Amino acid sequence: MPFDVTPRLFEIDESLNYGIRYEPSRLSGYKFGINTMTDKACSHVSNTFKCVDHPTYFYGCEEAIVSNREPHELEDVKVKWRICRDTAWAMLDITLPNVSYKITSDKHQTEVNERIILLHGIDGSCSNIALFGGIDFFCTNKQVRGKYAQLKKKNTSGFSMENFISDLTTARQDFDEHCRMLQVWAETPIKANVRLLLDKIVKSERLSKKMYSLAQQEISKRGKNMYALYSAFTNYSSYADERNGFSLRNTGNDTQAQSMWNREQQVAQWVDSKPFQDLLVA
């Protein structure tokens, strides 16, 4: 009888494929994390810090994702790794092309695919995080659904990878519900001065001015609605080059991936802000 072997959704990036062991630090209350492949220190953390290595985390999350989705939903999956802090911080961005929803305004139609984001840090730079979102197929803007569509567990002494996988298995968010919300946004006109609105939401004159220019571009394509404004936000968090004028400073540090992720969190805060939410119920 042949074995029932489920194909992998992804292979872990080669640079992350190592184990971790710990050695005492000369600083009381701390320990060194040692990369078992290179035998070099990769972290300096509190003795109460507890985490698994990257392969254990990401493949464990994969198991949970596969367990609550239909086989056809997992076909042609697209994955992208973002890695920084000398491989101590890693993010896996998964897009499911076969899970999609059309968003239509009076001027434009686009398709949104489901997105799953997994973050992991072995040096205390981030918690164990799984988030759910989407990706706008028209412009490939990445979406995070906000603070309620996530699973987050800190690397404290009580952290259990087994429990995290169990929670992730039952935490699948309703993608259709997310997209129905986006459709409402596409049907909701912006009943405010966009420039003044951005000043209230962004709270940075320089950033607000550049965001206004980006919002005008999105409005010209999608119409003057709340989804167009949201698309301007997600453009900012998806790109950092001449396409949108929001380039990152070249600091010479290994932090660009983390900086772009911080932008996504910033956008989630803007969407949850009172000025944005007030216009949705006006």
Functional labels for PLM-detected ranges:
Residues 35, 39, 44, 85-86, ...:
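Functionally constrained cores in energy, signaling, and assembly domains
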Residues 1-62, 68:
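Feature for intrinsically disordered/low-complexity regulatory segments and propeptides
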Residues 66-98:
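A short acidic/basic microdomain associated with nuclease active sites
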Residues 1-21, 76-79, 93-282:
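Intrinsically disordered, low-complexity regions enriched in serine/threonine
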